[in-house]
Amino acid sequence: MNTAPASWVFQWPLHAGDFRDPNYYLRLSYAVDASWTVGTSLSRGPYDRQDAAGIPAGKDTGDFPQTLAGVDVQYAIGAVEVFAEAYWTQIQAPLVDNLELWSWYVEAKYKILPGLFGAVRLAQMIFGSIDDASGVSHQWDRNLTRVEFGGGYFFTRNFFTKATVQLNYTMGGREPHDNLFVWQVGLGF
């Protein structure tokens, strides 16, 4: 990979020097049986060059990598599918302590009728602490709990519509009221 896993897809085009400090990615998974699959992922690489503006003189993006490690589980039986993932990430920042973050989710999907499904997801992002200039420790962002529920319909194998409601709860401080309703029509090929 030529950029960190937390970067936007629009930052992925190749440029001269992109592989000077590459991002390494490892993924292992094992199908326990027809119903269970377990996996793990590991990634380590530098910030994207667009983040280099605040890096001290004599350093470059390769001196401040992001490390990501996670596990995932998938289970399916009959009309029910369950997915779960948990990830830890650490971003080595040039001007503050290392930034750590834990995130996880559990999702269940139920096939109500052929083509018709419903789903629910619970997720959290738990931010680590950094020391301010006076040495006092603070969380570097507010923890987030997210609940999603929705459903959809597959008209064909590759043509579908779905709707989702996402409720976001930020812990501590002002609640930004950033809940979402999303309706999507998709066509895969």
Regions found by a protein language model. Give the residues of each.
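Outer-membrane beta-barrel pore domains
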Residues: 32, 36-189
